[in-house]
Amino acid sequence: MLNLIAAVDEALGVANDGGIPWQGKIPTDAQYFRDQTSKGIILMGYGTYKEFDSPLHDRENFVVARPDSGELKPGFVGVPDAAEFLDQHGHDLVWVIGGAALFAQTLARADQLLLTRVVGDFHCTKFFPTFSDAFELQSEASPHVESGITFHFESWQRTVPATQ
């Protein structure tokens, strides 16, 4: 099963050149991310990988990285191709955690989307792909406010068969 998990602003923005605008400001979202992905397999792009000093605990950490990317930090495993990786792990629970290019590359195969909707436009330069035609909203939690930022959690389930 392939799940994509992301926090997005009202324009589906996920990051800008300085990183994730709400990073560290909404700890409930960070806890939600940990709770959902714990004990699972996570797949991230190289840019997302560079944001981590160490692998995420209680998870298998895979990075889509080109051979010329150099040696990865201990605890991370490089994979050359997301599609091939997903073919090999098709029966496992895999979480794609970013970045924007990897979300776009894997959306057609995703079974579920777990989104944190952050209220406002944070002038992001990197975006989550449009998805509403292939997915149906399954649940939407009540809003939270932390550090002056309003957000809520959504779960979307695929309604149109995934493509490989």
Predicted regions and their residues:
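Enzymes that bind and transform nitrogen-containing heteroaromatic metabolites
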Residues: 1-164
